[in-house]
Amino acid sequence: MRQESGRSMIEMLGVLAIMGVITVGAIGMISTAMRTQKRSAVNDDVIQIVTGVRQLLGEFDDYSHINNATIFGAIGMNAKNPYGGTYELNVDPANSRQFIVSINGLSECDCKYFVTKAWSDSIGYQRSNGADGGATGSCTDGNGRNTVYITYGE
């Protein structure tokens, strides 16, 4: 009788199935890590933008002199956010002593996250879909077309 060596087809399919399960789990973990990293980057960017605006325009009585190109150039920052959209600065039309940081180009999920996030130093908390947050925004547009507005100032 001959001695055969090697693996059977069943054993190979079992190994491939196990590898598939491991791969799916790894992809899920990587996706979560990337989403968390992008959200942290946006938080850090907004803090840098707000600090820059306050340092550059703090001597004025209002923020009516806000200019996106000047502000982003002075703080050495690109207006592009990690989601492929942009950051924008505008004076609050209802109160020139306040300015609004806009985060454009968000998915519905990320928009909802940023609307309900408690933004430090933002003006009040806005009620949005039953959740308290320091920002406003409609998160019903298609992916990549949602915008969040965060108001800062007095």
Where are these regions (language model features)?
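N-terminal alpha-helical signal peptides/signal-anchor transmembrane segments
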Residues: 30-33, 43-64
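N-terminal single-pass transmembrane signal-anchor helix
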Residues: 1-34, 42
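Periplasmic/extracellular, small/polar-rich flexible segments of pilin-like filament-forming proteins
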Residues: 55-154
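Short, well-structured alpha-helical interface segments that form or flank functional binding sites
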Residues: 41-44, 109
